[in-house]
Amino acid sequence: FKQSFLHRVELLKKIPVSQVQEIVANIKLNEQLVEFIKTYKNRSYIVTGNLDVWIDGLIEKLGMGKNVFCSKALVEDGYVQDVFNIVEKDAVIRQMVLPFVAVGDGNNDAEMIEAAEVGIGYGGVRPVAPSVLECATHVVYQEDKLVYFLNKLV
């Protein structure tokens, strides 16, 4: 993950942070998931490798406050200059109060999903990575089914 992430950042360094923020702001969100997160924001966390400067608007929109673990970047003159912290999901896991539920779709989510009491592979946007399929206790492909299941767990 680290190498591919740094390569992606290197490509996006040429684009102003404000433009990336605008793209992120226009991503269609799963409304039922947004409502779930807002309802349970004190019990929900976002753990992502994405850069803080790219997702700050999204985090604010969700009202997540400090319940976010993400990578951090140095910005100068409106452009990413350097990444000074890449989130390590396994380190985040060790900070979680047990038991916890984890939802993810990518290879970099597998350790977190495996460590969770309930690990959910969610294929709502793209196929669930094989590494997640191997360790998930559940796999869901529809937003309404995911939200229904999460509501049963809280």
Can you say where each PLM-predicted feature lies in the sequence?
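A metal-dependent, Asp-based hydrolase signature
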Residues: 1-39
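C-terminal cap/substrate-recognition subdomain and adjoining C-terminal extension
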Residues: 25-154
